[in-house]
Amino acid sequence: MKQAIHPEYKKVTATCSCGATFEFGSTAREDFYVDVCSQCHPFYTGKQKQATTGGRVERFNKRFGAAIKRN
């Protein structure tokens, strides 16, 4: 195997806007910041707000449902 052709593998720290830090190995870059992580993302915390806007079928029935029922 050739020597000294592989990139340097170093520890990198990702810091979230909520203050959580994660350390892992990488060859790509140095420390960086992220907007959301598993500790503050609404999907993972269970505080997810769901906007029930209805699907395509409900939208169709809202527009044409009365016309179909008359026939």
UniProtKB/Swiss-Prot annotation:
Pfam families, A to Z: Ribosomal_L31 (PF01197)
This protein's GO CC annotations: ribonucleoprotein complex; ribosome
Cofactor: Zn(2+)
Keyword vocabulary terms for this entry: Metal-binding, Ribonucleoprotein, Ribosomal protein, RNA-binding, rRNA-binding, Zinc
GO MF annotation list: metal ion binding; rRNA binding; structural constituent of ribosome
Binding site for Zn(2+): C16, C18, C37, C40
BP terms from Gene Ontology: translation
Protein name: Large ribosomal subunit protein bL31
Taxonomic lineage from the root: Bacteria, Pseudomonadati, Pseudomonadota, Gammaproteobacteria, Oceanospirillales
Gene: rpmE
